[in-house]
Amino acid sequence: MTIFDNYEVWFVIGSQHLYGPETLRQVTQHAEHVVKALNTEAKLPCKLVLKPLGTTPDEITAICRDANYDDRCAGLVVWLHTFSPAKMWINGLTMLNKPLLQFHTQFNAALPWDSIDMDFMNLNQTAHGGREFGFIGARMRQQHAVVTGHWQDKQAHERIGSWMRQAVSKQDTRHLKVCRFGDNMREVAVTDGDKVAAQIKFGFSVNTWAVGDLVQVVNSISDGDVNALVDEYESCYTMTPATQIHGEKRQNVLEAARIELGMKRFLEQGGFHAFTTTFEDLHGLKQLPGLAVQRLMQQGYGFAGEGDWKTAALLRIMKVMSTGLQGGTSFMEDYTYHFEKGNDLVLGSHMLEVCPSIAAEEKPILDVQHLGIGGKDDPARLIFNTQTGPAIVASLIDLGDRYRLLVNCIDTVKTPHSLPKLPVANALWKAQPDLPTASEAWILAGGAHHTVFSHALNLNDMRQFAEMHDIEITVIDNDTRLPAFKDALRWNEVYYGFRR
């Protein structure tokens, strides 16, 4: 069972009574056939639920009102099978607060050249019925997605499925609670921000809990539960000699397991699905949570270090979006560069907290090593390299008057050498279009040093996310040129300033 099983998407057909009962009967039959086929053949993440035809303003308004108040409804897919006068949709669309997708399709793929008549034309009017619906969306300045293609087309299936992931993610975000253990890293700017504005814009809440409250829960974990979890570690990971039974760091592994169990219990009891820590506020914990955070991220929790609640929330959102897809998604940080003409590279990592969902190795190494930051006992961590291939790094920043999402398309590569003195998980990548352009554009746009790294999601996914939440997106990819990029930043400043 996944989070998508908790939601459904309503399939709504727009028509009118002008064409008579026989046409409406055929429309209903077509809709039933299409919905059944999509549910069985399209591999959509959510179930489509066919609703009664929308043929009058009252019927359409009722559907939109019911969608708003049904917690299982993640959004609406609308198909204008015949012409459906768009003034009938105004009241419903005015109140609709769920995501909306217009499926611009028709029942038949090919025209029946020898038999086509006006009855056929009246029945299959997506071509201009969809344009009428599009006008009222534009007139009302209402954001909605449009997918064009035959309902049996795999590309259309994939695009609808991708939109469904965004719709479910948006509903999950409205209920998301972010727990901050301690505050921000002192004097850091980009990890701070307006939590009230974030809740108004996205729906997630951010609150702080004392580390001492967490420590109480950690200390209540039984030795039996700790030992059972360590047994799981031994089956999932390659344990270094120091972490094995009778190893000199075995106690550190036991403490890491206790922290993991305590953190998970605290988060579950509070209904949290994202959290932050900071190495400057560890009072009562015996080590910086490293292994615990890595494993919780792999279970779907959002996380970021140093109190960075925006990145923690974004990671949770992207975890939901990517559920069931190939490839992982993790907290990440641009750490250091490798400058080599024609082969500039970025080494991404963090002190400890990189999600093993992006690991290249089937069994990461579990080790305990010294960490100078934090002033605590040596922490346990998983060590691995990252899968290779196309990926993205994304950053959500607070500009005061708006939120900006930055996305850099990257290509992860194999680490060419071992890193015997760097016992942390890492990712190595080439930034698009090149490191100088990518880094300069990122800096000019104010991108954070913390990001969400993903092999599972792509630029189109993040564009949909930005559109659905009505926020600015700034893209750095192979098409980026700095002069045009700077112009786009200036234009966006005017556009979003005008909208205030």
From Swiss-Prot:
Free-text remark on how the cofactor is bound: Binds 1 Mn(2+) ion per subunit.
UniProt pathway: Carbohydrate degradation; L-arabinose degradation via L-ribulose; D-xylulose 5-phosphate from L-arabinose (bacterial route): step 1/3
Binding, Mn(2+): 306, 333, 350, 450
Catalytic activity: beta-L-arabinopyranose = L-ribulose
InterPro entries from the UniProt entry: Ara_Isoase_C, AraA_central, AraA_N, AraA_N_sf, Fuc/Ara_isomerase_C, Fucose_isomerase_N/cen_sf, Lara_isomerase
Top EC group: isomerase
Superkingdom, natural source: Bacteria
Cofactors required: Mn(2+)
Annotated CDD domains: L-arabinose_isomerase
EC number per UniProt: 5.3.1.4
Pfam families: AraA_central (PF24856), AraA_N (PF02610), Arabinose_Iso_C (PF11762)
A Gene Ontology BP annotation from the UniProt entry: L-arabinose catabolic process to xylulose 5-phosphate
Gene Ontology cellular component terms for the protein in this record: cytosol
Alphabetically ordered keywords of this record: Arabinose catabolism, Carbohydrate metabolism, Isomerase, Manganese, Metal-binding
GO terms assigned for molecular function: L-arabinose isomerase activity; manganese ion binding
Family listed: Belongs to the arabinose isomerase family.
Subunit architecture: Homohexamer.
HAMAP family hit by this protein: Arabinose_Isome
Annotated function: Catalyzes the conversion of L-arabinose to L-ribulose.
Protein name, UniProt field: L-arabinose isomerase
Organism: Escherichia coli O157:H7
Organism lineage: Bacteria, Pseudomonadati, Pseudomonadota, Gammaproteobacteria, Enterobacterales
